[in-house]
Amino acid sequence: MAYAPNVKNILVFPAGTEIALEIHDALKFSKFVKLFGATSVPCHAEFVYERCAENVPYVDDPALIDSLNALIDEWQIDYVYPAHDSALLRLTQERDRLHAAVVTSAEETVEICRSKNRTYEYLAGAPYLPQSYPDAAAVPSYPVFIKPSVGQGAVGARRIDDREHLDEALADGVEYAICEYLPGDEFTVDCFTDRHGKLLFAGPRSRARIRAGISVRSERFEADGGIMTIAEDINRRFDFNGAWFFQLKKNAAGEYRLMEIAPRIAGTMCVSRNLGVNMPLLTLYNMWGYDVSIINNGNAELLDRAFINRFRTDISYSTVYVDFDDTVTVRGRVNAILMMFLYQARGAGKEIVLLTKHADDIEESLDKYAVSPRLFNEVIHIRQGEDKTVYIKPDSIFIDDSFAERRAVHDNCGIPVFDLDMVESLLDWRA
């Protein structure tokens, strides 16, 4: 595919974080963007980024900038999109050394927000701050809540019930933010600030279930006046460019208290994106000097995440043979996952052959299910009792729900065979 002259090359680093995966999901279909990824270790990025470099130095390595510049020059990168708090800080502070622009907010904003203690100091006097304490001696009562001042997710965050355990926790050499314990609900507010500093969107979502600091069950709800007041005040005090978010929790009296602020994409901003607010893309529009507006469908929305399987296989083939009954169609419906693969295979230049013993007129049945016969390079309609193996050429794969058919093809043709549940291993998610 030829890219238009105005397409921008975007390098996401590090490309394997949940933040990076959300950036990828948000930008992969944009006609204005060509995505690239870079990681320090082998990770999930290689399964979703079509162009991905590994073994880039870690974010705290002095060699990082030179390594990224080599990729920027090789790939003609226009923008680097940081996808981790530490990467955001490092690349913002050293953006003058990079050969591409960094998608970021003002340096002072990034630096303050990287530390919870600095954030609380900067916002001193704001009514939505939790009660915080400089050290254990200043704590008047328990429980309290501690969290690394510089950190992300829920790593190291915990409730402390007495002085003994607080002293023990503080002895590990980590700088903590020590705050009042907040027993109420916790949630995140996704925000977008346009290039003129105007807050265009503030969308709260719950953090009902957390895994590794990422909200894996989240439900959006309407922002009330209290949330909007906090969002507007934070936006006024900081210099944000595009997407940012803050986390709130309620105290025992049901009042909102600020947990943290981050001037970056959040891994669960997909909740806002699927309302129509594509934060990663809107932030790029800011970078490009565009004036933007927001379309928000405003519908109820519940997200629940689980692990997804993505595979890399050494199977090579030029032709796909596929059955119809209980394969292309299952329980009276088209098999959407299989169709996804078939269209992907066709786009990759593979031949697709429908090989079926269908009892009825196959063209009428294809038409009934709105499956175009043009999807297939050939339709082979054989009688019941005929042997499918005689129609199969080498350098092929075979997809059929019937174990007996798969066994015959595997043993007689020596090619890989797939039941429906195995098709997921053939999908290529890279973009």
Model-derived features: where do they sit?
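A short glycine-rich, hydrophobically flanked beta-strand micro-motif that places a catalytic Asp/Glu
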Residues: 241-253
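Acidic di-acidic motifs
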Residues: 15, 323-325, 398-402
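ATP-dependent carboxylate/phosphate-activation module, predominantly the ATP-grasp catalytic core
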Residues: 179-239, 250, 262-288
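Alpha-helical substrate-recognition element adjacent to the catalytic core
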Residues: 295-383
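Non-catalytic pre-domain segments flanking phosphatase-related domains
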Residues: 241, 264-322
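Active-site nucleotide/adenylate-binding loops and adjacent lid/helix of ATP-dependent enzymes
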Residues: 109-184, 194-198, 225
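ATP-binding N-terminal substructure of ATP-dependent carboxylate-amine bond-forming enzymes
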Residues: 1-104, 419-421
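Conserved Lys-Pro-Asp/Glu-containing loop-to-beta segment of HAD-superfamily phosphomonoesterases
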Residues: 386-404, 409
